Swiss-Prot record:
The chain crosses the membrane at residues 19-36, 66-82, 89-105, 116-133. Signal peptide: none annotated. Its main location: mitochondrion. It comes from Arabidopsis thaliana. This is Mitochondrial import inner membrane translocase subunit TIM17-1. The keyword Transmembrane helix applies. Belongs to the Tim17/Tim22/Tim23 family. The keyword Acyltransferase does not apply. Component of the TIM17:23 complex at least composed of TIM23, TIM17 and TIM50. The complex interacts with the TIM44 component of the PAM complex. Induction: Up-regulated after antimycin A or rotenone treatments. It is a multi-pass membrane protein. Essential component of the TIM17:23 complex, a complex that mediates the translocation of transit peptide-containing proteins across the mitochondrial inner membrane. Links the inner and outer membranes.
């Protein structure tokens, strides 16, 4: 079964990929958040300008914070991949915990431990949801494949459920009615023409042909 790690970039390129994706996500999400917050906190008559100013001041900073987090996370992830020589959800969980703890070292060991716990739990939830979604998708795909294979391998009609009729292609009643009406009309016209031709032939055959004159003198 495929895991979310199997679809990611290789380790040297993974760091740059995650840094760029995290910066874009932080810039877009942070800009929207700070714009709404600036509009809400600004006085009446200057809400839009206050929101735009808050966006310009704090939007790029949010993107930078997210990019730093993404870069550290990918660095720890690649280090664990090379150390353990395999990729599994434990790499992501341990990388999230290490990233959270490393970013909070300036606040003390207690804050660093709490941040590491939060990061590990958050990544564990994300990995669990990803594994569940992959499992559900693979199960549905396998069931659909088995149904299609069974339907194609059975003879015609044996794959039908008891009491279920074999689907018959539907035809339009109006088109069939018009076709039958035109068909009956042309059939009647053809029968009438055939009747007239037969009567004409019968009349012509009823007259005997005149004898051919001979010019022999007796």
């Amino acid at each position: 079964m495929g895991t979310p790690e199997s679809s990611r970039e290789p380790c040297p390129d993974r760091i740059l990929d995650d840094v760029g994706g995290a910066f874009a996500m932080g810039a877009v999400g942070g800009s929207a958040y700070h714009l709404i917050r600036g509009i809400y906190n600004s006085p009446g008559g200057a809400r839009l300008s206050g929101g735009v100013q808050a966006l310009r001041m704090s939007g790029p900073r949010s993107g930078g914070s997210f990019s730093v987090w993404g870069g550290l996370y990918s660095t720890f992830d690649c280090a664990l991949v090379y150390a353990r020589q395999k990729e599994d959800p434990w790499n992501s969980i341990l990388s999230g915990a290490a990233t959270g703890g490393f970013l909070s070292l300036r606040q003390g060991l207690g804050a660093s431990a709490r941040s590491a716990l939060v990061g590990g739990v958050l990544l564990a939830m994300i990995e669990g949801v990803g594994i569940m979604l992959n499992k559900v998708q693979s199960t549905a795909h396998n069931e659909q494949f088995m149904e299609d294979h069974a339907a194609t391998s059975l003879p015609y009609g044996m794959g039908q459920i008891s009491g279920q009729s074999v689907p018959v292609p539907e035809t339009s009643s109006s088109s069939s009615g018009s076709v039958s009406w035109f068909g009956s009309l042309f059939k009647k016209k053809k029968e009438t023409e055939d009747h007239h031709s037969e009567s004409r032939t019968h009349i012509l055959e009823s007259f005997d042909a005149p004898p051919v004159p001979t010019y022999e003198f007796k």
